[in-house]
Swiss-Prot record:
Presence of the UniProt keyword Cytoplasm in the record: yes
GO cellular component terms, semicolon-separated: cytoplasm
Comp. bias regions, Basic and acidic residues: 1-16
Chief localisation class: cytoplasm
Organism: Saccharomyces cerevisiae (strain YJM789) (Baker's yeast)
Basic residues: bias regions: 17-28
UniProt superkingdom: Eukaryota
Location in or out of the cell: Cytoplasm
Pfam family, one: NpwBP
Binding partners and assembly: May interact with the nuclear pore complex.
Protein's UniProt name: Altered inheritance of mitochondria protein 4
Gene: AIM4
Segments for region (Disordered): 1-30
Length: 123
């Protein structure tokens, strides 16, 4: 007998026969595992929606990254008359109003040389 005609030696014939005549026990096990996976996915989606709800509730109190970049002008902590006159926040950061009680601006920069004041600088 030819090897191509013999179904015991032909791999494609065996694969096709398994699909055409499936084993009931294997099919039942596959259906059960798929139903368990579906239940787990539903539980995971429920947890994700609860987490998203908590995230939305906490987003109003966040001092970190934010999508909107409002300009506060001179009231912003990011304001600088030379570098940032509009007071815009860096990308992905929230713009916070300046509070003089908690944040002190330096009006001028003073060099802190310590004991190095005696060194002569070449011209």
């Amino acid at each position: 007998m030819d090897q191509k005609k013999d179904p015991s030696n032909n791999l494609t014939e065996r694969r096709v026969s398994k699909v055409q005549r499936p084993n009931k026990k294997k099919v039942r096990n596959q259906v059960e595992s798929l139903s368990r996976n579906l239940e787990r996915n539903k539980e995971g989606q429920l947890l994700q929606t609860v987490s998203k709800g908590h995230l939305k509730a906490d987003s109003g109190h966040s001092l970190g990254r934010e999508k909107e970049n409002g300009e506060l002008g001179i009231r912003s902590i990011f304001y600088d008359k030379d570098w940032n006159p509009r007071g815009t926040a860096p990308s992905h950061y929230r713009n916070i109003p300046y509070n003089p009680a908690t944040f002190k601006r330096r009006t001028e920069v003073q060099a802190r040389l310590g004991n190095l004041e005696n060194i002569k600088i070449p011209k």
